[in-house]
Amino acid sequence: MDHSCQTLTTVSTPDPFMVFANGSYYLTFTSGDKIEIWASKTLNGFEETARKETIWTPPPGTAHSADLWAPELHAIYGRWYVYYAAAHPKHGNKSHRMYVLGGPPAHEDPTQGQWEFLGRIHGMPDQWAIDGTVFELHGGLYMVYSGWPLDSDDESDLMQQLFIMKLDDPTMAADGASGEPVAISTPEQPWEFSRDANGDHGINEGPQFLESPDGGWKGIVYSCAGSWTHEYKLAVLHYSGGDPLDPRAWPKGQEPLLQAGWGRQGPLWARARKLPVFGWQWRQRR
Protein backbone atom coordinates (compact mmCIF):
# COMPACT_ATOMS: atom_id res chain seq x y z
CA MET A 1 0.00 0.00 0.00
CA ASP A 2 1.31 3.43 -0.95
CA HIS A 3 1.29 5.85 1.99
CA SER A 4 3.01 8.69 0.14
CA CYS A 5 1.75 12.27 0.36
CA GLN A 6 1.55 14.19 -2.90
CA THR A 7 0.93 17.89 -3.38
CA LEU A 8 -1.45 18.42 -6.29
CA THR A 9 -1.65 22.22 -6.38
CA THR A 10 0.41 25.15 -5.16
CA VAL A 11 -2.57 27.50 -5.30
CA SER A 12 -5.58 27.59 -3.01
CA THR A 13 -8.24 25.02 -3.91
CA PRO A 14 -10.65 25.04 -0.93
CA ASP A 15 -13.16 22.22 -0.48
CA PRO A 16 -11.54 19.92 -3.07
CA PHE A 17 -13.43 17.03 -4.62
CA MET A 18 -11.82 14.63 -7.11
CA VAL A 19 -13.16 11.81 -9.24
CA PHE A 20 -11.48 9.50 -11.75
CA ALA A 21 -13.51 8.67 -14.85
CA ASN A 22 -12.90 7.88 -18.50
CA GLY A 23 -9.15 7.83 -17.95
CA SER A 24 -8.91 11.31 -16.38
CA TYR A 25 -8.84 12.91 -12.95
CA TYR A 26 -11.37 15.70 -12.41
CA LEU A 27 -10.99 18.22 -9.58
CA THR A 28 -13.63 20.68 -8.39
CA PHE A 29 -13.22 23.18 -5.57
CA THR A 30 -14.64 26.43 -4.20
CA SER A 31 -13.98 29.25 -6.66
CA GLY A 32 -16.42 31.75 -5.17
CA ASP A 33 -18.31 33.14 -8.16
CA LYS A 34 -18.18 30.23 -10.63
CA ILE A 35 -17.80 26.47 -10.97
CA GLU A 36 -14.46 25.20 -12.29
CA ILE A 37 -13.27 21.73 -13.23
CA TRP A 38 -9.61 20.85 -13.64
CA ALA A 39 -8.89 17.75 -15.70
CA SER A 40 -5.69 15.77 -16.21
CA LYS A 41 -4.66 12.27 -17.25
CA THR A 42 -2.15 12.11 -14.41
CA LEU A 43 -1.68 13.16 -10.78
CA ASN A 44 2.02 13.72 -11.37
CA GLY A 45 2.35 17.42 -12.09
CA PHE A 46 -1.42 17.72 -11.88
CA GLU A 47 -1.54 21.51 -11.66
CA GLU A 48 0.77 21.96 -14.64
CA THR A 49 -0.91 19.38 -16.86
CA ALA A 50 -4.53 20.07 -15.92
CA ARG A 51 -6.94 21.65 -18.36
CA LYS A 52 -8.81 24.30 -16.38
CA GLU A 53 -12.37 25.00 -17.49
CA THR A 54 -15.15 27.16 -16.06
CA ILE A 55 -18.37 25.22 -16.68
CA TRP A 56 -20.83 27.60 -15.02
CA THR A 57 -21.05 31.26 -14.06
CA PRO A 58 -24.39 32.29 -12.53
CA PRO A 59 -26.21 35.39 -13.77
CA PRO A 60 -25.30 38.33 -11.51
CA GLY A 61 -27.77 39.47 -8.89
CA THR A 62 -29.61 36.16 -8.66
CA ALA A 63 -30.35 34.15 -5.51
CA HIS A 64 -27.51 31.77 -6.40
CA SER A 65 -24.82 34.15 -7.68
CA ALA A 66 -22.66 34.65 -4.57
CA ASP A 67 -20.36 32.47 -2.50
CA LEU A 68 -20.57 29.27 -4.53
CA TRP A 69 -19.15 26.67 -2.13
CA ALA A 70 -17.93 23.08 -2.20
CA PRO A 71 -18.99 21.86 -5.67
CA GLU A 72 -19.04 18.09 -6.15
CA LEU A 73 -18.96 16.32 -9.52
CA HIS A 74 -20.96 13.09 -9.68
CA ALA A 75 -21.86 10.66 -12.47
CA ILE A 76 -25.41 9.47 -11.68
CA TYR A 77 -27.68 7.37 -13.88
CA GLY A 78 -25.58 8.09 -16.97
CA ARG A 79 -25.22 11.87 -16.62
CA TRP A 80 -22.81 14.29 -14.97
CA TYR A 81 -24.15 16.49 -12.16
CA VAL A 82 -22.56 19.16 -9.98
CA TYR A 83 -23.99 19.84 -6.51
CA TYR A 84 -23.00 23.07 -4.76
CA ALA A 85 -24.17 25.67 -2.26
CA ALA A 86 -24.75 29.30 -3.26
CA ALA A 87 -26.10 32.48 -1.69
CA HIS A 88 -27.91 35.68 -2.66
CA PRO A 89 -25.43 38.59 -2.91
CA LYS A 90 -27.77 40.88 -0.95
CA HIS A 91 -28.53 38.44 1.86
CA GLY A 92 -25.16 36.80 2.50
CA ASN A 93 -24.43 33.54 4.27
CA LYS A 94 -27.90 33.06 5.75
CA SER A 95 -29.27 32.60 2.21
CA HIS A 96 -27.07 29.60 1.33
CA ARG A 97 -29.07 26.80 -0.30
CA MET A 98 -28.15 23.69 -2.30
CA TYR A 99 -28.23 23.81 -6.12
CA VAL A 100 -27.52 21.37 -8.94
CA LEU A 101 -26.20 21.62 -12.49
CA GLY A 102 -26.82 19.01 -15.18
CA GLY A 103 -24.06 18.19 -17.63
CA PRO A 104 -23.19 15.91 -20.53
CA PRO A 105 -23.53 12.10 -20.58
CA ALA A 106 -21.28 10.41 -18.03
CA HIS A 107 -19.20 8.70 -20.74
CA GLU A 108 -18.15 12.14 -22.03
CA ASP A 109 -15.62 14.64 -20.70
CA PRO A 110 -17.49 16.91 -18.24
CA THR A 111 -15.22 19.86 -19.08
CA GLN A 112 -16.19 19.81 -22.75
CA GLY A 113 -19.96 19.25 -22.79
CA GLN A 114 -22.88 21.59 -22.19
CA TRP A 115 -24.08 22.36 -18.67
CA GLU A 116 -27.46 23.67 -17.56
CA PHE A 117 -28.75 25.14 -14.32
CA LEU A 118 -31.35 22.80 -12.80
CA GLY A 119 -32.08 24.94 -9.75
CA ARG A 120 -32.50 23.92 -6.14
CA ILE A 121 -33.14 20.33 -5.11
CA HIS A 122 -36.89 20.02 -5.62
CA GLY A 123 -38.73 19.19 -2.41
CA MET A 124 -35.87 20.28 -0.15
CA PRO A 125 -37.04 22.59 2.67
CA ASP A 126 -36.18 26.28 2.66
CA GLN A 127 -33.30 25.69 5.03
CA TRP A 128 -29.74 27.00 5.24
CA ALA A 129 -27.76 24.18 3.63
CA ILE A 130 -24.20 23.64 2.40
CA ASP A 131 -21.74 20.83 1.60
CA GLY A 132 -24.24 18.48 -0.03
CA THR A 133 -22.94 15.10 -1.17
CA VAL A 134 -24.81 12.24 -2.86
CA PHE A 135 -24.31 8.47 -2.80
CA GLU A 136 -26.13 5.22 -3.50
CA LEU A 137 -26.91 2.78 -0.68
CA HIS A 138 -29.11 -0.33 -0.85
CA GLY A 139 -30.26 0.68 -4.31
CA GLY A 140 -31.43 4.12 -3.19
CA LEU A 141 -29.98 7.56 -3.87
CA TYR A 142 -29.30 9.76 -0.83
CA MET A 143 -28.07 13.27 -0.12
CA VAL A 144 -26.29 14.25 3.09
CA TYR A 145 -25.64 17.91 3.83
CA SER A 146 -24.82 20.37 6.60
CA GLY A 147 -27.71 22.57 7.72
CA TRP A 148 -29.02 24.79 10.45
CA PRO A 149 -31.65 23.15 12.68
CA LEU A 150 -35.00 22.73 10.94
CA ASP A 151 -37.06 23.43 14.04
CA SER A 152 -35.51 26.82 14.78
CA ASP A 153 -35.64 30.33 13.30
CA ASP A 154 -32.27 31.12 14.87
CA GLU A 155 -29.85 32.47 12.23
CA SER A 156 -26.94 32.95 14.61
CA ASP A 157 -25.00 30.11 12.88
CA LEU A 158 -24.13 28.58 16.27
CA MET A 159 -25.35 25.10 15.30
CA GLN A 160 -24.78 23.03 12.15
CA GLN A 161 -26.15 19.49 11.94
CA LEU A 162 -25.81 16.75 9.33
CA PHE A 163 -29.03 15.79 7.54
CA ILE A 164 -29.86 12.90 5.24
CA MET A 165 -32.68 12.75 2.70
CA LYS A 166 -33.67 10.25 0.04
CA LEU A 167 -33.82 11.34 -3.60
CA ASP A 168 -36.15 10.04 -6.29
CA ASP A 169 -33.70 11.24 -8.91
CA PRO A 170 -30.60 13.48 -8.93
CA THR A 171 -32.68 16.67 -8.69
CA MET A 172 -35.72 15.73 -6.61
CA ALA A 173 -36.42 14.61 -3.05
CA ALA A 174 -38.40 11.41 -2.65
CA ASP A 175 -42.15 11.63 -2.15
CA GLY A 176 -43.56 11.43 1.35
CA ALA A 177 -41.73 11.05 4.62
CA SER A 178 -38.66 9.43 3.02
CA GLY A 179 -37.94 12.70 1.23
CA GLU A 180 -37.95 14.75 4.42
CA PRO A 181 -34.50 15.56 5.85
CA VAL A 182 -33.54 13.70 9.02
CA ALA A 183 -30.79 14.89 11.35
CA ILE A 184 -28.25 12.10 11.77
CA SER A 185 -25.57 14.07 13.60
CA THR A 186 -25.82 16.95 16.05
CA PRO A 187 -22.73 18.45 17.70
CA GLU A 188 -22.64 17.00 21.19
CA GLN A 189 -19.03 16.14 21.93
CA PRO A 190 -16.81 18.92 23.35
CA TRP A 191 -14.42 18.47 20.42
CA GLU A 192 -17.21 19.40 17.96
CA PHE A 193 -17.38 22.97 19.33
CA SER A 194 -15.33 26.14 18.98
CA ARG A 195 -15.83 29.37 20.91
CA ASP A 196 -15.56 32.92 19.63
CA ALA A 197 -17.01 36.31 20.57
CA ASN A 198 -20.47 35.21 19.41
CA GLY A 199 -20.60 32.08 21.55
CA ASP A 200 -20.02 28.34 21.24
CA HIS A 201 -20.26 27.08 17.66
CA GLY A 202 -21.24 23.43 17.31
CA ILE A 203 -20.34 22.52 13.75
CA ASN A 204 -20.78 19.36 11.67
CA GLU A 205 -20.05 19.91 7.97
CA GLY A 206 -18.25 18.56 4.91
CA PRO A 207 -19.80 15.05 5.00
CA GLN A 208 -18.39 12.37 2.72
CA PHE A 209 -19.73 8.83 2.39
CA LEU A 210 -16.96 6.20 2.35
CA GLU A 211 -16.94 2.46 1.85
CA SER A 212 -14.06 0.02 2.26
CA PRO A 213 -13.03 -1.94 -0.85
CA ASP A 214 -14.59 -5.14 0.49
CA GLY A 215 -17.79 -3.38 1.56
CA GLY A 216 -17.24 -4.40 5.17
CA TRP A 217 -17.21 -0.83 6.45
CA LYS A 218 -19.46 2.05 5.45
CA GLY A 219 -19.81 5.44 7.02
CA ILE A 220 -19.55 9.20 6.77
CA VAL A 221 -16.43 11.19 7.50
CA TYR A 222 -17.19 14.81 8.37
CA SER A 223 -15.45 17.97 9.55
CA CYS A 224 -16.29 19.49 12.92
CA ALA A 225 -15.57 22.50 15.14
CA GLY A 226 -14.56 25.85 13.61
CA SER A 227 -12.74 25.83 10.28
CA TRP A 228 -11.19 29.17 11.24
CA THR A 229 -9.51 27.62 14.29
CA HIS A 230 -6.75 25.14 15.11
CA GLU A 231 -9.53 22.92 16.52
CA TYR A 232 -10.95 21.87 13.13
CA LYS A 233 -10.86 18.10 12.80
CA LEU A 234 -12.36 15.02 11.16
CA ALA A 235 -14.81 12.61 12.79
CA VAL A 236 -16.83 9.57 11.73
CA LEU A 237 -20.40 8.31 11.65
CA HIS A 238 -20.38 4.54 11.20
CA TYR A 239 -23.23 3.07 9.15
CA SER A 240 -24.40 0.10 11.21
CA GLY A 241 -27.02 -1.13 8.74
CA GLY A 242 -30.76 -0.84 8.38
CA ASP A 243 -32.73 2.16 7.19
CA PRO A 244 -30.33 5.00 6.24
CA LEU A 245 -33.05 7.48 7.28
CA ASP A 246 -32.96 6.19 10.87
CA PRO A 247 -30.51 8.28 12.94
CA ARG A 248 -29.72 5.15 14.98
CA ALA A 249 -28.09 3.68 11.87
CA TRP A 250 -25.30 6.28 12.14
CA PRO A 251 -23.55 5.97 15.53
CA LYS A 252 -20.88 8.59 16.09
CA GLY A 253 -17.29 7.83 16.98
CA GLN A 254 -16.39 8.72 20.55
CA GLU A 255 -13.23 10.55 19.54
CA PRO A 256 -11.98 12.44 16.47
CA LEU A 257 -10.66 10.49 13.51
CA LEU A 258 -7.95 13.03 12.75
CA GLN A 259 -6.93 16.28 14.40
CA ALA A 260 -4.06 18.73 14.44
CA GLY A 261 -0.98 18.30 16.59
CA TRP A 262 1.23 21.15 17.71
CA GLY A 263 2.42 22.03 14.22
CA ARG A 264 1.05 24.51 11.71
CA GLN A 265 -0.90 21.96 9.68
CA GLY A 266 -4.11 20.10 10.40
CA PRO A 267 -6.97 18.28 8.69
CA LEU A 268 -9.76 20.30 7.14
CA TRP A 269 -11.72 18.40 4.51
CA ALA A 270 -11.72 14.70 3.68
CA ARG A 271 -12.31 13.19 0.28
CA ALA A 272 -11.64 9.59 -0.73
CA ARG A 273 -12.04 7.88 -4.05
CA LYS A 274 -11.00 4.65 -5.72
CA LEU A 275 -8.14 5.84 -7.88
CA PRO A 276 -5.89 3.64 -10.01
CA VAL A 277 -2.66 4.97 -8.51
CA PHE A 278 -3.25 5.33 -4.79
CA GLY A 279 -6.35 3.24 -4.10
CA TRP A 280 -9.35 4.16 -2.01
CA GLN A 281 -7.28 5.64 0.82
CA TRP A 282 -6.04 8.53 -1.29
CA ARG A 283 -6.83 11.75 0.55
CA GLN A 284 -6.78 15.40 -0.41
CA ARG A 285 -6.99 17.94 2.38
CA ARG A 286 -8.74 21.24 2.04
Give the ranges of each region predicted by the language model:
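Carbohydrate-active catalytic/glycan-binding domains of CAZyme proteins
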Residues: 1-286
